[in-house]
Design a protein with these regions (language model features):
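Acidic/polar loop-and-plug regions of large Gram-negative outer-membrane beta-barrel proteins
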Residues: 203-226, 310, 315-375, 575-587, ...
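Extracytoplasmic gating/loop element in the C-terminal half of outer-membrane beta-barrel translocons
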Residues: 339-341, 795-887, 891
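Short, small/polar-rich motifs associated with maturation and membrane association
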Residues: 1-289, 303, 910
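Glycine-rich, aromatic-lined ligand/substrate-binding cores of catalytic
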Residues: 769-801
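C-terminal extracellular loops and terminal segments
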Residues: 649-659, 699-717, 763-780, 808-824, ...
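Conserved small-residue
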Residues: 169-222, 319-320, 672-769, 831
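Extracellular/periplasmic, surface-exposed regions of secreted and cell-surface proteins
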Residues: 10, 292, 296, 300-301, ...
Length: 926
C-alpha cells in the first residue's frame, strides 16, 4: 500500500508554474537578464544551471497590495505564499512562505534576503522593489549557508539609471476592505436551546424554562435575557487603507540615485472608538524613507550604499491585539450579558467577567506600539585589472537594528449584571471607575543584525569564446535577539567556479564551509554542490527557439536545533524537597530534568534536481523540473528508548531521515500583435510529497509508526460515525477514553485488539503545515492604453484539525460560544446527517480525540488579484512634461471557492479575518 501511494504521488507530483510575463520576450532578453546567486555571483538566465525564477517590478504592481509580502500570492513558481490575516502591523502574523513544500520535521522557514541581507519582507512596499527571485535547488542556494537549506527568496530594491535625467514619480491609492470572513455564531435563543439539550444529554436539569426561552425570542427582557450580536455591535463591515509615495531617481555614468518616501495608513473595524480624549481604533501607520546610491570613486572603484528607515506605529485596545479582538467574538455568546446594565455600567457576568469587547474598545483606554528600524548596507568593488584582466575585489557590510516599544494609557471601568431575586431585578457591580488614564511603557522586542563579506571574483573569456569565472568569498553574520541563547554567529568560506563552452555546455561548482554557534558543538559542515547544463537548441527563427537541460546536486546543512543550549544538561532547583531541624524547615534541591545532547551531526540535505527550459515560437516558455531531497541527521527525541520510570527527559539523537520529492512545470505565453494588442497568460499546478524514512520509535502496533507518513502529518482515530443507540454502544469495542453516550463519536479498532485507545491512531494522508497542491492561473491584456490583469490562486491536499479553531468547532464546554455551523450539523439537530457529535456542557474525552471527524482535507480557489487600468496617451501627457500616467482599479480576494462552509479555508483561525478589497489609485512619472 505504501509503495503504491508513493508511485501515485510521484506521477502526480507535477508543478505547472506561471512565470512573470509583461511583454513578448526574446532570446536576447534571456542573455541579458541576470540571475543573482549571491555575493557577487551573477549568471545570465540563458546560461545558468540553477533552478531560479524572477518577477519584476512591473508584474508586482498589478496587485492591490501595498506590502511586498502581500503581492507574491500565486506570482512565482515554487514559492507558495498564503495570507494569514487581514490587518498589518503585528510581526509574525503576516504572509507565510514556503519553497517546495515540507522537507523536514525541523525548521521549515525559508531565507528571505533584501539587498543581500536577511530582513522582514512585510516592511517593504511594492513600489520600492525592482525584482524578486526565488532560488530553489542546490545550485541556486549554495552560497547562502545554513539558513538557505529550505530555499531562498531574494529581493532587490530599486536603483537609479544612467540616462542623465532627473525623474520623479508620485502615486496614491485608497483601498476599501469589506466583508470580513468569519463564522456566524448562534442567536441567544439557539444558544439557550442548545444549552438545554446539552444539559439533558449530560443528565442535568435545563438551564432555561420555556418562558425564559421565549424572552430570548421576543426581546421582552433584554437586560436579563439579552440577545447581543457582538459582531454587529463592535465591528463595522468596512475598513480603509491609504498609501502615497514620492520617489526621485536618475543619474549619470558616474552616479546613480534612487530615493523614496512612502506612507501607509490603515484603519480597522471598531465602531465608535473615538472617546474624545483617546481613540482605540485599530490603526497601522508606517513611513519608509529610502536612499540608494551608486557612484564611481574612480574608473576602477565603485561604491553602492542602501539605507532604509522605517517608522511604524500601531494603535488599538490595551492588552487586546488585532487577533485577540476577534477571538473574543468566538468566546462570548449572545446571551452572556447585555451591552450595558440597567444601572448604565458595562455588561459582564460571573462566568465571563469583563469580556465585554465593546467596553474594552470604548472604555479601557488605548495602546500604541512604536517600531523603529534602520537597514543599512554598503559594498565596494575594486577592479584589479592592473594585476590581471577580469579580477575584482569586493567588500561589503550591513547593519540592521529594530526596536519595538509599547505604551499604554489605561483606565478601569465598572461592569455588572442584572438578575431577579424574589421577582425583583437586582444588579451586581464589579470593577472600579477611573477618570484618568494611567500611563505605562516598556521595550517589547529588539534585535540587531550585522554582516560582513569580502572576496575576489575573476572572469575570463578564452580565445575560443568560452567563459571561465571564479568567486572566492568569506562572509559572517552576527544576529542578536531577545531571550536566552538567541545570540548567533555564522561564518562561511566559499569558492564558486563557472565554465561555459560555445554557449552550449555549462558547469558550476561551489565548495563551501559553513560554521555556526547555534548548533554547538557541531559547528562546521562542508557543503559541495554541482550544476551542469546543456543548450540543445538556440534558433531564434525556428519553432523551437531555445532548449536547455539542467542537472544539479549537492549537500547542504542547517544549524537548527530543537532547543537552545541543547548541549547542556538541564536542572531544576525546585525538586527534591526535604525537611530538617527541630523547627521542620524545608529546602529544595537540584534535580536533573533533561540529559544533554552533545554528540550529533548537523542536519544534512542531499539534493538533486533535473530541469529543462524551452521557448517555442518566440511566444511560449516552458520550464520543467523534477527534484528529490533526503534529509538525514534530523534530531529526534530519544524518549521512546528510555523508560518513563527514570523521570528525566531524554537527550536527542540524530537518527531522523525524511525524503521529499515532486516536479515543476512552468508555462507562460506572451505575444504582441501587429495591431498593438498585448496578451500574456500563465498556469500553475504543483504537488510535493514528503515521507519519513527513519525515526526513533518503538511502536506497539504497526499503525503507530510514523515511518512512511508525511513529515508534518497529524495523527488521530478513524471515525465510523456516531453511536445511534445503546445497542450500538454495547456491540462496539470497549472505548477507554471515558463514558460514551448516544451521539458520541464511534471509532474504528485499527489494531484489532478489541478496545479503542491511543493505540488506534493513524497518520493522515497529508501534512498540516502547507498545502501539498498549489496552482495558479494568470491572464493579462492591453490595447491602446486599456488593460486588464487577473491572478487566480488555489491550494489543496492539506489536512487541518478543525477543533483547533476554538469557538467554531469546540462547542459549549467551558462556557464556549456556539457557531451556527456546529449547531446545524451536530447529532442533536442533524441526526443521521450529522457531521459533529452531540452537544454537551462537559469536556467529553471521547469526542475531543483527534479524529477524522475533525480532520478536513481543505481546498480553495481565489481570484487573488485583478486589475483594470488605463494609461493616458502620450499626446495628452507630454505637453505636461509627464512621461507616463496610469489610473487603475484593483481587487483582491473578490471571488473565493472552498470546501469549508463556516470560514475561509485558507485562514482557519479566530484572528483578524481576511477581507475582500477594492483599490483605486493613480501613478504619474515625470
Amino acid at each position: 500500500m505504501k509503495i503504491r501511494n508513493k508511485y501515485i504521488y510521484t506521477l502526480m507530483g507535477l508543478c505547472v508554474a506561471p512565470l512573470a510575463v509583461s511583454a513578448q520576450v526574446t532570446l536576447s532578453d534571456k542573455e541579458s537578464q541576470k540571475v543573482d546567486l549571491g555575493y557577487g555571483v551573477e549568471q545570465s538566465e540563458f546560461l545558468t544551471t540553477a533552478a531560479a525564477t524572477t518577477i519584476t517590478a512591473e508584474e508586482l504592481r498589478r496587485t492591490s497590495a501595498i506590502s511586498l509580502a502581500d503581492a507574491l500570492y500565486g506570482k512565482l513558481p515554487g514559492l507558495n505564499a498564503f495570507q494569514n490575516t487581514g490587518f498589518k502591523g503585528e510581526e509574525g502574523r503576516g504572509a507565510t512562505f514556503n519553497i517546495r513544500g515540507v522537507q523536514t520535521t525541523g525548521e521549515k522557514d525559508i531565507l528571505i534576503l533584501v539587498d543581500g541581507v536577511e530582513r522582514p519582507l512585510d516592511r517593504l512596499t511594492v513600489e520600492e522593489v525592482e525584482s524578486v527571485t526565488v532560488l530553489k535547488d542546490a545550485a541556486a542556494v549554495a552560497l547562502y549557508g545554513h539558513e538557505a537549506i529550505n530555499g531562498v527568496l531574494l529581493v532587490k530594491t530599486k536603483h537609479g539609471n544612467k540616462d542623465g535625467k532627473y525623474h520623479f514619480k508620485v502615486g496614491a491609492s485608497h483601498k476599501i476592505q469589506f466583508n470580513p470572513q468569519m463564522a456566524d455564531m448562534v442567536s441567544a435563543y439557539d444558544y439557550a436551546n442548545a444549552l438545554n439539550r446539552a444539559r439533558q444529554n449530560d443528565g442535568l436539569a435545563p438551564a432555561y424554562t420555556s418562558a425564559e426561552l421565549q424572552k430570548f425570542i421576543d426581546g421582552s427582557d433584554p437586560l436579563v435575557y439579552p440577545n447581543v450580536n457582538w459582531k454587529d455591535e463592535v465591528f463595522k463591515n468596512t475598513a480603509h487603507e491609504s498609501n502615497a509615495y514620492l520617489s526621485f531617481f536618475g543619474g549619470t555614468d558616474k552616479v546613480q540615485y534612487y530615493t523614496q518616501l512612502d506612507y501607509t495608513d490603515a484603519r480597522g473595524l471598531y465602531k465608535n472608538p473615538d472617546q474624545g480624549d483617546w481613540n482605540s481604533q485599530l490603526k497601522y501607520s508606517k513611513a519608509n524613507i529610502r536612499a540608494n546610491v551608486d557612484f564611481e570613486v574612480s574608473n576602477t572603484t565603485r561604491v553602492s550604499a542602501n539605507i532604509l528607515g522605517i517608522l511604524m506605529e500601531t494603535n488599538g485596545v490595551p492588552n487586546v491585539n488585532s487577533s485577540d479582538a476577534w477571538w473574543h467574538l468566538y468566546k462570548v455568546p449572545a446571551l452572556a450579558f447585555p451591552i450595558r446594565t440597567a444601572g448604565g455600567v458595562w455588561g459582564g457576568s460571573q462566568t465571563y467577567g469583563d469580556f465585554n469587547l465593546l467596553a474594552k474598545s470604548q472604555g479601557a483606554g488605548f495602546m500604541k506600539t512604536h517600531q523603529r528600524q534602520i537597514w543599512a548596507n554598503m559594498t565596494l568593488e575594486q577592479d584589479l585589472d592592473v594585476i590581471t584582466e577580469g579580477l575584482k575585489f569586493y567588500v561589503g557590510a550591513s547593519y540592521d537594528n529594530s526596536s519595538n516599544t509599547i505604551e499604554t494609557r489605561t483606565k478601569g471601568y465598572q461592569y455588572g449584571w442584572n438578575y431577579y431575586s424574589n421577582g425583583v431585578m437586582q444588579e451586581t457591580v464589579m470593577g472600579t471607575v477611573e477618570d484618568k488614564l494611567t500611563f505605562n511603557h516598556w521595550v517589547d522586542t529588539q534585535w540587531r543584525i550585522a554582516t560582513f563579506n569580502a572576496g575576489l571574483k575573476y572572469a575570463l573569456q578564452l580565445n575560443n569564446g568560452d567563459n571561465f569565472g571564479a568567486n572566492a568569498n568569506y562572509n559572517m553574520k552576527s544576529e542578536i535577539r531577545d531571550g536566552q541563547s538567541n545570540t548567533w554567529y555564522r561564518a562561511n568560506w566559499q569558492l564558486a567556479l563557472h565554465y561555459d563552452h560555445a554557449n552550449r555546455l555549462m558547469a558550476d561548482v561551489v565548495l563551501a564551509a559553513n560554521g555556526s554557534n547555534r548548533s554547538y558543538p557541531a559547528k562546521w559542515a562542508f557543503s559541495p554542490t554541482i550544476g551542469l547544463g546543456y543548450i540543445f537548441a538556440n534558433n531564434p527563427d525556428g519553432i523551437l527557439n531555445y532548449g536547455k537541460v539542467r542537472l544539479s546536486g549537492g549537500i547542504q546543512h542547517t544549524d537548527y536545533v530543537p532547543a537552545a543550549g541543547l548541549w547542556l544538561a538541564r536542572w531544576s532547583n525546585s525538586h527534591g524537597q526535604f525537611w530538617y531541624g527541630t523547627n521542620f524547615q524545608s529546602s529544595w534541591g537540584a534535580f536533573l530534568t533533561q540529559f544533554p545532547t552533545d554528540d550529533f551531526a548537523q542536519e544534512t540535505a542531499y539534493k538533486a534536481n533535473f530541469g529543462t527550459d524551452l521557448r517555442i515560437a518566440n511566444a511560449l516558455d516552458v520550464t520543467f523540473d523534477v527534484f528529490y531531497q533526503q534529509r538525514r541527521n534530523i534530531l529526534v527525541s530519544a524518549n521512546s528508548l528510555n523508560s518513563a520510570v527514570v523521570g528525566i527527559q531524554s537527550s536527542y539523537d540524530d537518527k531522523g531521515r525524511v525524503a521529499s520529492y515532486g516536479m515543476e512545470i512552468g508555462l507562460r505565453y506572451a505575444k504582441t500583435f501587429a495591431n498593438g494588442l498585448n496578451l500574456n497568460a500563465g498556469a500553475s499546478f504543483s504537488t510535493v510529497k514528503s515521507e519519513i524514512l527513519e525515526w526513533i520509535e518503538t511502536p506497539a502496533y504497526p499503525n503507530l509508526s510514523v515511518v512512511g507518513g508525511p513529515a508534518d502529518a497529524e495523527r488521530g482515530l478513524i471515525a465510523l460515525g456516531f453511536y445511534k443507540d445503546q445497542a450500538d454502544i454495547d456491540n462496539s469495542p470497549i472505548q477507554q477514553f471515558g463514558q460514551v453516550k448516544v451521539g458520541d463519536i464511534k471509532y474504528k479498532d485499527v489494531n484489532g485488539d478489541g478496545v479503542i485507545n491511543e493505540n488506534d491512531y493513524v497518520a493522515q494522508d497529508y501534512g498540516n503545515t502547507f498545502p501539498s497542491l498549489n496552482y495558479a492561473f494568470t491572464f493579462g491584456a492591453e490595447y491602446k492604453g486599456f488593460g486588464v490583469n487577473a491572478t487566480f490562486q488555489g491550494a489543496g491536499h492539506q489536512v487541518k484539525n478543525l477543533r483547533y479553531v476554538d469557538g467554531v468547532w469546540g462547542a459549549l464546554s467551558d462556557n464556549r460560544n456556539l457557531s451556527q455551523e456546529y449547531y446545524d450539523n451536530c447529532f442533536d439537530i442533524a441526526g443521521a446527517n450529522a457531521l459533529y457529535p452531540r452537544l454537551s456542557t462537559e469536556n467529553v474525552a471521547n469526542n475531543a480525540q483527534n479524529s477524522t471527524i475533525w480532520y478536513s482535507n481543505i481546498s480553495w480557489l481565489k481570484l487573488r488579484d485583478c486589475e483594470v487600468y488605463y494609461k493616458l496617451p502620450a499626446k495628452v501627457i507630454e505637453p505636461l512634461k509627464v512621461s507616463s500616467a496610469k489610473v487603475f482599479v484593483q481587487g483582491q480576494n473578490l471571488l473565493s471557492f472552498d470546501n469549508i462552509d463556516a470560514m475561509d479555508a485558507e485562514n482557519l483561525n479566530t484572528g483578524y479575518p481576511v477581507m475582500k478589497s477594492i483599490n483605486l489609485g493613480l501613478s504619474v512619472q515625470f
